[in-house]
Amino acid sequence: MIGKLTGILDSVFEDHIILDVQGVGYVVFLSNRLLSSLPERGQAVSLFIETHVREDAIRLFGFETKVEQDWFCLLQNVRGVGAKVALAILSTLPPPQLAQAITLSDIAMISRSPGVGKMVSERIINELKNKALPSNAPHQSMPHFVSYSSETSSQAGTQHTGHQHSMDALAALTKLGFERDQATHALQEAIKAFEGETPSSALLIRHSLKLLSSHLK
């Protein structure tokens, strides 16, 4: 099995490249998004590799990050989704947006991918929404958040609950693949929007995702 390849970009085609690794040219299939961001020919390229072995062919699929490779594999666990469809989805939606679409059950967002209709989009959401989604977020200590408003010391318990909801929401957002600083900023804005209230972690996540989505468009 090949886990990773590092070599020189030899040739670029419509859906794949030839990567020269010490004189051996590997045909590696890539998403359109990755193809459009490649360096000039002759430059070094390093890719995580997923190998598909069939009776008539061996195909290599390349990814810029491990989390993209994990998404590629996870998507193919969904009935009716093969390598071609999985690449089409990753060509249209980077991991954070794909995770967001599944979390919010956003059929339209997934259906933007070429060759992916409403039925397949619904199936992806239904089969993956309760599963652990691939993430590159490291485990870190929780930051200090904007405090929920409090007028008396008797509300200390409410503040503690609110802070716990904030921590739960941040953990969920980073697990979805958002950068920690980006998720923290959106969450702080969400907390301000609920000033005087103690929203659940689910409400904070939904509000934060709307803010993050507006920045991604």
UniProtKB/Swiss-Prot annotation:
Write out the GO biological process terms: DNA recombination; DNA repair
Major localisation:
cytoplasm
Domain of life per record: Bacteria
- Region called Domain I, residue ranges: 1-64
MF term (GO), any = four-way junction helicase activity
Q: Give the residue ranges for region: Domain II.
A: 65-145
Q: What Gene3D superfamilies does the record point to?
A: 5' to 3' exonuclease, C-terminal subdomain, DNA helicase RuvA subunit, C-terminal domain, Nucleic acid-binding proteins
A GO CC annotation recorded here is: Holliday junction resolvase complex
Asked if DNA damage is a keyword of the record, the answer is yes
Under InterPro entries, the record lists: DNA_helicase_Holl-junc_RuvA_I, NA-bd_OB-fold, RuvA, RuvA_2-like, RuvA_C, RuvA_C_sf
Q: Where is this region: Domain III?
A: 161-217
Q: Which UniProt keywords apply?
A: Cytoplasm, DNA damage, DNA recombination, DNA repair, DNA-binding
Q: Where is this region: Flexible linker?
A: 146-160
Task: State its location(s).
Answer: Cytoplasm
Job description of the protein: The RuvA-RuvB-RuvC complex processes Holliday junction (HJ) DNA during genetic recombination and DNA repair, while the RuvA-RuvB complex plays an important role in the rescue of blocked DNA replication forks via replication fork reversal (RFR). RuvA specifically binds to HJ cruciform DNA, conferring on it an open structure. The RuvB hexamer acts as an ATP-dependent pump, pulling dsDNA into and through the RuvAB complex. HJ branch migration allows RuvC to scan DNA until it finds its consensus sequence, where it cleaves and resolves the cruciform DNA.
Spell out the subunit comment.
Answer: Homotetramer. Forms an RuvA(8)-RuvB(12)-Holliday junction (HJ) complex. HJ DNA is sandwiched between 2 RuvA tetramers; dsDNA enters through RuvA and exits via RuvB. An RuvB hexamer assembles on each DNA strand where it exits the tetramer. Each RuvB hexamer is contacted by two RuvA subunits (via domain III) on 2 adjacent RuvB subunits; this complex drives branch migration. In the full resolvosome a probable DNA-RuvA(4)-RuvB(12)-RuvC(2) complex forms which resolves the HJ.
* Family statement drawn from the similarity comment of this UniProt entry: Belongs to the RuvA family.
Q: What is known of its domains?
A: Has three domains with a flexible linker between the domains II and III and assumes an 'L' shape. Domain III is highly mobile and contacts RuvB.
Which protein are we looking at?
Answer: Holliday junction branch migration complex subunit RuvA
Give the organism the record lists.
Bartonella bacilliformis (strain ATCC 35685 / KC583 / Herrer 020/F12,63)
Gene of this entry: ruvA
